[in-house]
Amino acid sequence: QRVPWQGHTTRYAVPAIYEEIKRHGTTLLFVNTRSQAELLFQELWRINDETLPIALHHGSLDAGQRRKVEAAMARNALRAVVATSTLDLGIDWGDIDLVIHVGAPKGASRLAQRIGRANHRMDEPSRAILVPSNRFEVLECEAAIEASDEGAQDTPPGGEGALDVLSQHVLGVACAAPFDADELFAEVRS
């Protein structure tokens, strides 16, 4: 089915996503928002005729529920997990065979991080599929893939003398209590 001009549910691709889940051992599906996670999980569950164990993981779920999903992942008891950025970092789930990113990844760094969740075996590369939600996201997905292939990172490099940190510090000092401007200037210069 063709990618629609608008929308963010990716409903058009759910049957193909389900087929990929059936073909792989464990699939991690990343989405950008909680509502996308809920909708995708619901759509996958609706067509889950084989009753594959599919779970949901995002920040609005009860911490106990998230821990249950994480424990099931650690036991290799799940075939798929639909997740937001809550599973971007942290524990490496070595038995994840495939990452599917639903919607544009919103940057090469995020894409690389999410692809890195899959396949920590030495003899095989990580596998990922990008599923744009609409035709405009096709371009974003292509740009993120190209940037990732080139090793480009879209996160600004940290550096000495970051002005945003300085401004936050000065604002914090100013809001906390009376201060001596000369002392603050000397602190900043040190």
Task: Specify the residue positions occupied by each region the protein language model found.
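Helicase motor core with emphasis on the C-terminal RecA-like subdomain
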Residues: Q1-A176, A181-S190
